[in-house]
A protein has these predicted regions:
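Non-catalytic, peripheral interaction segments enriched in hydrophobic/basic residues
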Residues: 1, 21-137
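Short, conserved micro-motifs composed of acidic
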Residues: 1-19
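C-terminal helix/juxtamembrane-tail motif
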Residues: 140-155
């Protein structure tokens, strides 16, 4: 890490350096290479899941709760995941959140049982979802014939 001096504005005020910035819902970290933090995404995912599970709880069937998880909570967790580089630890921390929700739905303490239930109910793992979203993003980006994209590709 570099220890840089603060930037001084024309009116003499000092701008300090930040370790992260939140832009369009993505937290970008101060690092040597582009990386994102998923702490806020996980918190929003847990908040959404707990709100839904608190309302329907054990009244609704597992099918309904899994469908709500897939349609309402997972998009929160996966927001802009296609543009953020994912490390193995990022994938495992996001998968842990989903597995924890499935464990709560099926009232189990076993990750293996939760993963099997998720698979049987059609909840794909984070790695697969991220790859699908990234491929779709790149195909959509490639399909658009924009000057900016052609310029970026030529660099």
């Amino acid at each position: 890490k570099y220890n840089c001096c603060n930037i001084t504005t024309s009116d003499g005020q000092s701008l300090s350096w930040a370790t992260s910035i939140r832009y369009l819902g993505i937290v970008i970290l101060n690092a040597a290479s582009f990386c994102c933090s998923f702490k806020h995404s996980k918190a929003a995912f847990y908040r959404a899941f707990n709100a839904i599970f608190g309302k329907v709880g054990r009244v609704a069937s597992e099918n309904v709760i899994i469908e709500l998880l897939s349609k309402k909570c997972l998009p929160i967790l996966l927001y802009a995941i296609e543009v953020c580089p994912l490390s193995k630890s990022n994938i495992s921390e996001l998968q842990f959140a989903v597995t924890g929700a499935v464990m709560k739905i099926f009232d189990t303490k076993s990750k293996d049982i939760a993963n099997t239930c998720a698979e049987l109910f059609g909840v794909r793992n984070i790695s697969s979802l991220a790859n699908t979203r990234k491929n779709k993003f790149l195909l959509d980006l490639n399909a658009k014939e924009s000057i900016m994209f052609k310029t970026l590709c030529s660099l």
